[in-house]
Amino acid sequence: MSLVISHHTALWMHCSPKFASSAAVANYIEGPINASVTGEKVDRWYRPALSELTGIPLADLGSVDYLLSRDVARHPSPLSRPHSWCGPLPDRTLLSLGNDIYLSAPKFTFLQLSGRYDLVELSCIAMAMAGWYLPSQGENGLSRHNPVVSIAQLKMPVCDIGKHWGIDKVERATRWALDNSRSPMETSLALLINTPRIRGGYGLVSPILNARIYLSAESRVIYPHRYCEADVSAPDSSLLFEYLGKAFHKEEHRDIRRELALQREGYQLQYVTIRQLLDPPQRNEIMRRYAHSAGDSLEPPTELIVRKRIALLRRLLPDRGLVLEDGGVIQSLPGWALPIAWS
């Protein structure tokens, strides 16, 4: 009998600063395994082993998600949550951690989570996994990690995984998701830009997130770095969109020099705040400028699209009353946020 870590626990292991590097070098297994472990064994033996493996105290580990074969009875406890999988586990979707413990690979983890969240939330999860952050219960509300998977890898071919019920949902959720996001606001802005109009977005050319702009020797005299990263930009555009959040004023001098260096390279910066995105006239002007930079145009929305857009905005952006004067946001964390012990 083996322990197959799944769902939220698998996501946290891949993205936790305490374990992500170990998960990244774990080896795939080729053959099937016996996923018929008992709940008693998970609680008494595997949880202590997992605590030792991750360095997280047993009392802080939380409830562990794990997979069982469909024909095995599930008996959840306060310490563990069993989930069933229909049919044999697919090849090369599990990573061996030793001691008969296996971790669901990133794309398999994402497929498991497809049954828990809607398309908008799944797109946000995909961009967090393929980006550099995960919402966290820690002090800053974000935990940093290297990308654990690419969006292309999440768009798994059906032949890799079989005709599982979540495949269509995964394909739809990753259709407009992008790599390389560094924050929830970059994710929200990107999804607003390229989600189709009929789903509430603006249906514009897909942006590039955090594109590297290498500086000339002359510009490096102004801003002594090899390159700058632009938060959001259209392909081959000289207009760069920068999210202006709470942290902006902490390095004001550095950002002024950075902006001057980028201007010398021929780029123009358009700053975007959360309050602007919440204000329809300002948001539409930002989208109009993005469309123009991409060689596109902004079409007026129909009544149906307006209703869809309001619904999408409610999913992607906080309520206006939760935005603080300094740009901070009072917002509840999603169910997939990294627990504080894992941060």
Enumerate the predicted regions with their spans.
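Surface segments flanking catalytic/ligand-binding clefts of nucleic-acid enzymes
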Residues: 147-343
